[in-house]
Amino acid sequence: MSYSPYIGRFAPSPSGSLHFGSLIAALGSFLRARSQGGQWLVRIEDIDPPREVPGAADDILRTLDAFGLHWDGKLMYQSQRTEAYQAKIDVLLASGEAYFCQCTRKQIQAIGGVYDGRCRQLGHQSGAIRIVNRARVNHFHDGLMGEVAVPDSFAAEDFIIKRSDGLYAYQLAVVMDDAKTGITEVVRGADLIEASCRQLSLFNQFGYQAPAWMHLPLACAEAGFKLSKQNHATPVDKANPLPALKAALAFLGQPIPDAHSVESLLAQAVADFSVASIPRRREILIDGGG
């Protein structure tokens, strides 16, 4: 699938400083966009206040800048988009395409872990809000991993678009934001690969142009455990970006330029960038947590 012009993005959540795992996603999406002569946007996904760390968003942006990963256009903050999310939900509720659900996580686990739509016709006026999933997607093509499929039961589920605590769900926000900014390809970590099917469902149901997808291997300190802010992955060093940039290039299977500045390294990395060289694996074990 080809698009013109190319628009990519990096969308971190401000739950801590940028670490090596998130640098891989940032660098991979940046190189892909720049190698296509396209734009690279940055969006701060700050719609989950309990998980957010004060000052983390600004720290992430300063780190991107220190690493030469300069974004195009205006920054988007999801916290400034809540009126748009609510307006969409109001339309969905009014049209019968969404409904309130009062099922607990424990109740859903008791029936096998997949929600069965039992609240769809009950007329609740409070609780979580679920989409009536009319555009189910159980497979898609990934630009690195190839054909990806999910279980039919997962694809068919009426998933949550607004939580019972009043917070907007990731699936709704990311689809509306990608559509708003005209994203043509999403390049991100493989931990979100299954979520793409749900996002594709929303793109289709809302009549939005869906992007292409490319999911990069995750950096893991041990099998099944990606580097993350939650497990205290070491932040990358803003004062000395070259070693981490070179390590991230190596992780992505790219040649390491003989460069002594961030600018020259990235310029050569863009020129050399090859998707075919990226390992087609969901995770790669690395030494340590940095």
Swiss-Prot record:
Textual note on the cofactor: Binds 1 zinc ion per subunit.
Gene3D superfamilies tied to this protein: HUPs
Domain of life: Bacteria
Binding site for L-glutamate: R9, F10, A11, P12, S13, E45, Y170, R188
Chain span(s) of sequence motif 'KMSKS' region: 226-230
Binding locations of ATP: K229
Annotated function: Catalyzes the tRNA-independent activation of glutamate in presence of ATP and the subsequent transfer of glutamate onto a tRNA(Asp). Glutamate is transferred on the 2-amino-5-(4,5-dihydroxy-2-cyclopenten-1-yl) moiety of the queuosine in the wobble position of the QUC anticodon.
Family: Belongs to the class-I aminoacyl-tRNA synthetase family. GluQ subfamily.
HAMAP family found in the cross-reference section: Glu_Q_tRNA_synth
Protein name: Glutamyl-Q tRNA(Asp) synthetase
UniProt source species: Shewanella amazonensis (strain ATCC BAA-1098 / SB2B)
Gene (UniProt): gluQ
